A protein has these predicted regions:
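A short SAM/SAH-binding and catalytic strip from SAM-dependent methyltransferases
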Residues: 124-138
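Core SAM-dependent methyltransferase catalytic element
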Residues: 217-220, 226-261
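Class I SAM-dependent methyltransferase SAM/SAH-binding core
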Residues: 58-114
């Protein structure tokens, strides 16, 4: 399913970038204080199986925000060329102000219109963190990501997915209303973005539905892994790749199917 259009005054796919513009600095401070947020991004980047410290590789970080996922890719592939892309100009401004090696750059673009910003193939890997549930047409986005990849190259979608588990939904709602939403309001003066985060996760695909999307949009070797801690069966790495050319050696993807949650 595609995300519903937002009601007037509510955050949704059509205006989420503007909401992140308004809350960029407080959002960066919040995620900066969350150690597991950064460690889980690093785990997703490592799960892509990028070889040789990324030497000679060209990687995309879609939905890079203020650069946390970019840093995760850089940690996994320090010798790669990495391009971070985000639709929020204020989030990108914060990302650009951080210290990066020469191989890292940033582009202001919407993930559903990458070509107009000069983002064209081919890439050796794509990381898309906390992005797909914010897009109006996730299938179209996945097809575009597939077209940007070299044959055999991986896509890692780092995302919340709770729809398949009543337990996961309950934990997610408890954490949001007990911690995330109050803390977001305290830091920024408004809870709107953090209420949107809560709602958008509940509305997003379950694990089975999203893996079906990936298969339907051309990805092969699709598998899922989750994370330890309270985020288990709440945050996932969805891994897949563009089909390789015949006789191409397989990539070293860390593709392990995750056990389903038990309610």
């Amino acid at each position: 399913m595609s995300p519903a259009k937002p009601e007037p005054g509510r955050i949704g796919p059509s205006n989420v970038a503007r909401a992140f513009d308004e809350h960029a600095r407080s959002y960066d401070r919040l995620v900066g204080a969350n150690r597991s947020y950064h460690e889980h991004l690093r785990m997703s980047a490592r799960r892509m199986g990028l070889r040789d410290r990324g030497a000679g590789l060209r990687l995309l970080d879609l939905g890079c925000g203020t650069g946390a996922s970019t840093q995760a890719l850089l940690d996994a592939a320090p010798e790669a060329e990495i391009i971070g892309v985000d639709a929020s100009s204020e989030m990108l401004s914060i990302a650009r102000a951080k210290t990066w090696p020469p191989g890292v750059s940033f582009v202001h673009a919407s993930a559903d219109d990458l070509a107009s910003a000069g983002i064209t193939g081919f890439y050796d890997g794509i990381l898309a963190a906390y992005l797909l549930r914010n897009l109006a047409e996730p299938n179209a986005a996945l097809r575009a990501f597939h077209a940007l990849l070299k044959p055999g190259a991986p896509l890692a979608v780092h995302e919340y997915s709770v729809a398949d588990s009543a337990r996961s939904k309950a934990i997610w709602s408890a954490v949001c209303w007990g911690v995330i939403i109050p803390m977001g309001k305290l830091r920024s003066g408004s809870a709107d973005l953090y209420k949107y985060l809560w709602r958008s996760v509940l509305d997003f695909d379950g694990v089975e539905a999203f893996t079906t999307r990936m298969h339907a949009t051309g990805f092969v070797d699709v598998k899922v892994q989750t994370f330890p801690g309270w985020q288990q069966h709440i945050v996932h790495t969805f891994l897949g790749r563009r089909a390789p050319e015949p006789d191409t050696p397989p990539l070293g993807l860390n593709l392990t199917k995750v056990d389903p949650p038990s309610d």
